[in-house]
Amino acid sequence: MRSIIRMLCICLALCLAMPALGEEAQQSAAPIVRVWLRRLGLTDRADLTLDGVYTAQLPSGVEMSFPKGSQVTVLVRSGELYLFYEGMSLHAGTALQLIRNASESTESEGIRFVEGGNFYPGDLTLTLTDQGLLRPVCTLSVEDYLLGVVPYEMSNSFPLEALKAQAVCARTYALSHVRGDPYYDLEDTTNDQVFRGVNLTYGNAIQAVRDTAGVVGTYKGELASCYYSASNGGQTELVENVWSGRGDWSYYQMTDDPYDLENPESVVRRATLKKSGEDLPEAFLTLLAQQLAEQMTAKGFDPTFRGLRVDGISAMELHTPKYDAPSRMWSKLDITFTWSGRTVTYPPAATATPEALPLADAGDQEISLFAQGQATATPAPSAGASAQPTQTPTPTATPAPVYGEWESMGETTLTLDVFPQLVRALEISISGSDNEMLTLTETDSAFRLEARRFGHGVGMSQRGAQWMPAMYSKTY
């Protein structure tokens, strides 16, 4: 009886749902995007809090309406979906849609996957992947989508004008990268743009989205590809240097970005090489030894970093840009240094000899190893006798290698590959993409290499965009 009454109440709530006349209705003309909420990592269960009036629609045509605040659970059982709500269960088959009903409420309205967490302001479609896992896809206006993108692709604490620039880039990217996939248009990960739902406390990001509503970047009347990355290292990169494929990318140029360089929050990795040759990293010495291996072997030296000593570094120079001018992504480093080598010998290891076993006394019983059918009785232990374990020979330690005296080999100049050998050996690789912008400075006692660029470097630098309005009053 209670289940019947509850079902009647749900149906009544559906009948009373009315269209909205507020701001949400005004945004109805905004383009719609479908976002696969892959970052949530759902497998066979979704616990949902409906912060709004929602209607569940099943492929069979059955509909159920849920009042705001309802908590529902969707489970995968034997390859199909089941919806559970207040003791009731509903077989949903292979697809389930939760449609948000229009409302005049100015408060948050959407679906929360974590109680008290961010909300997703749109419809939710649940289907199954080929692996039988939940595929949650949120369908919402691009303007609402940006509310969950801008403060995560760029911090809400950034200047408002920087956030506006981010909103325009993110909006243009979303609309120009809509997939033709039957299930979704965008992912909520860095495969597209990070989307984590809406947090209404991020007022700066919300204002930036509202103030730039509908603004996109275009080229020749078409949506442009407005790329951005965390930091370009002081110079923007060309699209064709990062991604393959054809296209007219003439609106992207390789230009200097002093704002990214000036921003102290731009990522920088540093390595200091003393001119005295002291305290050089083992990996760097290994790199030099590999370059000198033939010469070291010919002299009988140990061709590893242990057989090499750098006595002094007199010159270093970065050169050979990876791409055409004006690129400053150097791919080679010349290093001039004096060095010494030494021989190594390995003494033969001693062989451990186990102690000889004692011979049997003449009076001991003779036992034939080949006797058949005779069982030997187990002797009773003597009073007070204890078992004596057989001693295992102690292993002999490997003798330490014996090195000869250092022999000076004079001065030499080597050309090292910056990518990937040098940046890995000096541990100045930032993102592992082998695209860092390196600079070299010299002091009285050392050479210092600095590596910059976090991301692909194409388009807007987020750190540069942060610095421009903060220090130079630039607008988006």
Predicted regions and their residues:
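Conserved, single-site charged/polar hotspot
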Residues: 2-476
